[in-house]
Regions:
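Primarily membrane-embedded glycan-assembly and transfer machineries that use lipid-linked glycans
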Residues: 2-169, 193-308, 315, 388-394
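Hydrophobic/aromatic-rich transmembrane helices and adjacent perimembrane loops
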Residues: 307-322, 366-367
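Alpha-helical membrane-embedding segments
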Residues: 163, 186, 190, 211-216, ...
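Aromatic-enriched
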Residues: 31, 35, 322-396
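Transmembrane helices and adjacent periplasmic/lumenal helix-loop junctions
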Residues: 174-191, 303-313
């Protein structure tokens, strides 16, 4: 009876919600209390919530007409890389004391992810397992005050809105992710699965313009054009930077491949688009879920700037697939690999010597995600070929 009671307690969505909130609260206060003691380079010390400081100050820089996309070493380390519109959203937090603003920022991220998964089209008990499965990965992202949980939650919610034929809300969420991190716009490909395609395109255009012009509340037209020009410049320059925990990172560190990043991304896009050939599968919910899960993984492993906190997006995709699909030996092995080497590898469960000498330089965190992405797309294409002799709805 006690065992059943414990299982029932931890199977309640309210229990998980409380734990998510406690996670955000504890990590926020812990990082705040560490003060300015973190050194990224040189002798200057910054906070342990540097990302939040970057986001917060972007609003003040927008107001002051400063170039958002240059370094401000007097307040924070690294560059601001999101859109001018995102800096407007940070107005909600900008005037709050850091301890409160940081707490609310992390709570917003955690709650958007929680409710995005909570209201996923499949519902309980699938969502209960999903929320537990991603908990540790969420820890890593919140620890870094990142926006990735928000992006994951918004994209999952967009999928659910598509399923419920609420394309205006799906469009809003997808366009919003674009103004946070550009790659989120690829989720717009979901519209190919559903009717009312022109309605989605129209709403996407409306939201793109509306959100894109938000900074005009705090800057002039010329000032906004200036910021967007600088943002585009940063994105173009940023593309030639590091390879991160990405597919390219694995190919480079494992096999010595030093070039071909653009080719790899194009090949990845082609593979991602192939399942749309099988129009007859569009009515299959699991087919749509699997493709969406594959996309969430793609957004990370083909992102040359992918860092450990980014993987909450890919891991959410893995959770959506794992707890809605039929379990076989291959699926089980892939799930264990993902949980151990993607989610647990950066933690203290593994000695620091192994993490720094093996896991990090060889981008081990990305490997299970790459394997699952390949497996998912193989299954999608195999399913499309085996179940029908039609391609693009036409008999072969």
């Amino acid at each position: 009876l006690k065992r059943e009671g414990i299982i029932a307690f931890f199977s309640k969505q309210r229990t998980i919600l409380v734990l998510y909130v406690l996670l955000a609260t504890a990590l926020s206060l812990s990082n705040f209390n560490k003060g300015q003691t973190k050194v990224f380079s040189g002798d200057t010390k910054y906070t342990f919530y540097n990302n939040y400081v970057i986001f917060k100050h972007s609003f003040f820089h927008l107001q002051q007409g400063k170039d958002l996309y240059v370094l401000f070493p007097e307040t924070h380390w690294d560059l601001y890389k999101y859109s001018p519109s995102f800096s407007v959203a940070m107005a909600v937090f900008a005037y709050l004391p850091d301890w409160l603003g940081l707490l609310l920022w992390n709570l917003v991220n955690v709650l958007i992810l929680f409710y995005g998964v909570r209201y996923f089209i499949k519902g309980p008990p699938h969502t209960i397992f999903m929320l537990w499965f991603i908990f540790n990965e969420l820890f890593t992202s919140v620890l870094n005050s990142q926006s990735n949980p928000m992006i994951a939650g918004m994209l999952v919610a967009a999928f659910t809105f598509f399923e419920k034929d609420k394309v205006h809300w799906a469009a809003l969420l997808i366009v919003s992710t674009f103004y946070i991190k550009v790659f989120g716009i690829l989720a717009a490909l979901l519209f190919l699965f559903y009717p009312n395609k022109w309605r989605f395109i129209l709403w996407s255009a409306i939201w793109t313009v509306a959100i894109g012009l938000l900074p005009l509340m705090f800057t002039s037209t010329d000032g906004l054009i200036f910021q967007y020009q600088n943002w585009l410049r940063l994105l173009s320059e940023d593309h030639s930077g590091s390879i991160g925990y990405s597919f390219m990172g694995v190919l480079q560190t494992w096999f010595g491949l030093q070039s071909g990043k653009d080719v790899l991304v194009i090949v990845g896009l082609i593979i991602t688009m192939l399942p749309f050939v099988f129009v007859h599968k569009f009515k299959d919910l699991q087919y749509r879920i699997n493709w969406f899960a594959s996309l969430l993984i793609w957004l990370v492993i083909f992102n040359h700037k992918a860092e450990s906190p980014t993987f909450i997006i890919a891991f959410t995709g893995i959770a959506l697939w794992l707890f809605t699909t039929s379990i076989n030996k291959t699926v089980l092995v892939l799930a264990v690999l993902a949980f151990v080497f993607t989610s647990l590898a950066p933690t203290d469960l593994f000695p620091a010597s192994i993490r720094h000498s093996f896991f990090e330089p060889y981008a081990i965190k990305a490997v299970p995600c790459i394997l699952i992405w390949l497996y998912l797309n193989f299954q999608l294409i195999k399913s499309g070929l085996n179940k029908s002799h039609k391609i693009f709805g036409i008999e072969k």
